[in-house]
Amino acid sequence: TRSKLKLEFDDEKKIITLITPGNNKIVISDDQKSILLQDQNSNKIELNSSGIIIDSPKDIKISAKGKVTIDAVGNIESTAQADIKNQGLNINHQANIGFSAKGNATAELSASGQTTVKGGIVMIN
C-alpha cells in the first residue's frame, strides 16, 4: 500500500504474511503448519506442531485479576540463571511421593513464629 503495509499470499505453499512498515508481522503457514506473531522488538509467539513458543529479548509479564493456573500432563520445569522468587500470603508445596529441597552451598528453614518439623522418623545430620 502507499503506507508500505504488505499483505502477501503464497498460493503454492499456502502462506499468508502481513507486514507493517515497522516490521511487525503475522505469518500463517499451512506449509510449515505454524502461525507466527512477531513485533519490531523481536518479541514473538509461534504456534507449531511442536507446541507454543513465547520468546522475548526482554521481560515477559503474566497478570490476571483472577488466578493463574499452569497445568501439564508431563513435567513443569522452571530454571533461571539468577534467583527464582515466590511470594504470597501462604505458600504450599505438596508431593504425592517424594519431596526434596536442597541447597548446594547453604540451606535455611526459619520462621518468626513456631517452626514445626514432622515425620515418621525425623533425622537431623
Q: What is each stretch, according to the model?
A:
Residues 1-125:
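Right-handed beta-helix
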